[in-house]
From Swiss-Prot:
It catalyses: alpha-D-glucosamine 1-phosphate + acetyl-CoA = N-acetyl-alpha-D-glucosamine 1-phosphate + CoA + H(+); N-acetyl-alpha-D-glucosamine 1-phosphate + UTP + H(+) = UDP-N-acetyl-alpha-D-glucosamine + diphosphate. Pathway: Nucleotide-sugar biosynthesis; UDP-N-acetyl-alpha-D-glucosamine biosynthesis; N-acetyl-alpha-D-glucosamine 1-phosphate from alpha-D-glucosamine 6-phosphate (route II): step 2/2; Nucleotide-sugar biosynthesis; UDP-N-acetyl-alpha-D-glucosamine biosynthesis; UDP-N-acetyl-alpha-D-glucosamine from N-acetyl-alpha-D-glucosamine 1-phosphate: step 1/1; Bacterial outer membrane biogenesis; LPS lipid A biosynthesis. It comes from Heliobacterium modesticaldum (strain ATCC 51547 / Ice1). Mg(2+) binds at residues 103, 228. This is Bifunctional protein GlmU. GO terms for biological process: cell morphogenesis; cell wall organization; lipid A biosynthetic process; peptidoglycan biosynthetic process; regulation of cell shape; UDP-N-acetylglucosamine biosynthetic process. It is found in: Cytoplasm.
Length: 458
């Protein structure tokens, strides 16, 4: 195999995005579009491509970190100029250089691998990724000779009327022989309507020098979609979501209403899980087998066990064990950990707490900064009062305890194993194991009170 590297062009301003954020950092399927490009390159064995940065370059470098090395293009003078800026970063031992854009998140690793194979097997100086589309307006057109070899690429603004009728277009991704590429870059000039150094001009130079230029034609034209506007961003999102939905359905996941379910590209879902409408799976979430998720549920950066039911709920950065039931209308905040067979019911909020095996928080409760043992029942309306206005404090509820409805547990406080808290209590002291704790005023009944009140008002 030839020694390879890739140059990713990511220096543009993205003016039509109307955003302060660099264009390539806008997200598709939950991650910046340039990360999709780097993922595809990783699939091809390129672990650290060269990313050419300019507008918002520091933000791009901060986001990508050591996934890439970087070259600066301080002035945006065209694609050819961008590759010139990357030249010092290309190792001497590299034989083949791929050049592609950072705003093409739909390109797959399989397509890039096929492009590389076509290039290296042909012995060409340059290979162009192309597509045949119905409406080629705005794209550079591919010019071929009688043998079918590429002779040149003419940009839309420089094309004559005959050339504009050509439907085969440049997808903006190339493979080059390293030595031929940099020799040709030394010869290009900005003699065009844009006054820029076009990378595509090197292809004509290859031909003039007796080199071969070939094309690799895409079967799925959607892969070439570049993103220059919010509309195109939404179009790319739709294409990638369709891919992800098909991927998981092919893996044994049932989607009741596929168009209404959204996946992060890094999410993982087990077989025989059913996902109901209006559900969003974000971040590096892992969902086990045999679960029922949704409807109207959002799960982000969480690990869900097997045979879990989550209905109409929000789960953020949490861990849920096997056979749990969550919702409807529950809110699991970061740091929540549910052991096996836990029930969290309607209108329950849990934050930074561990709930033990078989325990239940059925409804209308807040549990924060707490450790709850096994087989605990927390009655409706229970609140762990964890905040004193300055610090957070921990509530500990040990195995088998029963917390009556409408209880306030004022932390720091411990409820011992198998203790019983009477309904309506406010607990401010530790409760020993096996004890009964009741803290409430004695009930008073005033008979005929309503009648006296009415009589006195006459």
């Amino acid at each position: 195999m030839h020694k390879r590297t890739a140059v990713v062009l990511a220096a543009g301003k993205g003016t039509r995005m109307k955003s302060r954020q660099p264009k390539v950092l806008h997200e598709v399927a939950g991650q910046p579009m340039i990360c999709h490009v780097l993922d595809a390159l990783t699939d091809c064995g390129v672990a650290q491509p060269i990313v050419v940065i300019g507008h918002g370059g520091e933000a791009v470098r901060q986001r990508l970190g050591d996934r890439a090395c970087y070259a600066w293009q301080q002035e945006q003078l065209g694609t050819g100029h961008a590759v010139m800026m990357a030249r010092p970063e290309v190792p001497e031992e590299v034989e083949t250089v791929m050049v592609l854009c950072g705003d093409t998140p739909l390109l797959t690793g399989a397509t890039l691998s096929a492009l590389w194979e076509t290039h290296e097997q042909s012995g060409a100086m340059g290979t162009v990724l192309t597509a045949v589309i119905d409406d080629p307006k705005g794209y550079g057109r591919i010019l071929r000779d009688d043998a079918g070899h590429v002779t040149a690429i003419v940009e839309e603004k420089d094309a004559d009327e005959k050339q504009k009728t050509i439907r085969e277009i440049n997808a903006g991704t190339y493979c080059f022989d390293r030595a031929a590429l940099f020799a040709a870059l030394d010869a290009i000039t900005p003699a065009n309507a844009q006054g820029e150094y076009y990378l595509t001009d090197v292809l004509a130079i290859f031909r003039q020098r007796g080199g071969l230029v070939v094309a690799h034609t895409l079967q799925d034209e959607r892969e070439i979609l570049g993103i220059n506007s919010r509309v195109q961003l939404a179009e790319a999102e739709a294409v990638l979501q369709d891919r992800l939905r098909r991927k998981w359905m092919d893996a044994g996941v049932t989607l009741i209403d596929p168009p209404s379910v959204f996946f992060h590209t890094k999410a993982v879902v087990g077989a025989d899980t059913i996902i109901y409408p209006q559900t969003i799976i974000e971040g590096e979430t892992v969902i086990g087998e045999g679960c029922r998720i949704g409807p109207a549920t959002r799960i982000c950066d969480s690990r869900i066990g097997e045979n879990v039911v989550i209905q109409n709920s929000v789960v953020l950065d949490s861990r849920i064990g096997d056979d749990c039931a969550v919702g409807p209308f529950a809110y699991l905040r970061p740091g929540t950990c549910l052991a096996e067979a836990v029930k969290v019911g309607d209108f329950v909020e849990i934050k930074k707490s561990v709930i033990g095996k078989g325990s239940k928080v059925p409804h209308l409760s807040y549990v924060g900064d707490a450790t709850v043992g096994e087989d605990v029942n927390i009655g409706a309306g229970t609140i762990t009062c964890n905040y004193d206005g300055k610090h957070k404090h921990v509530t500990a509820i040990e195995d088998g305890a029963f917390i009556g409805s409408n209880t306030n547990l004022v932390a720091p406080v411990t409820v011992g194993a198998h203790a019983l808290i009477g309904a309506g209590s406010t607990i401010t002291k530790d409760v020993p194991a096996g004890a009964l704790a009741v803290e409430r005023s004695r009930m008073k009944i005033k008979e005929n009170f309503l009648g006296r009140k009415h009589k006195g008002s006459q």
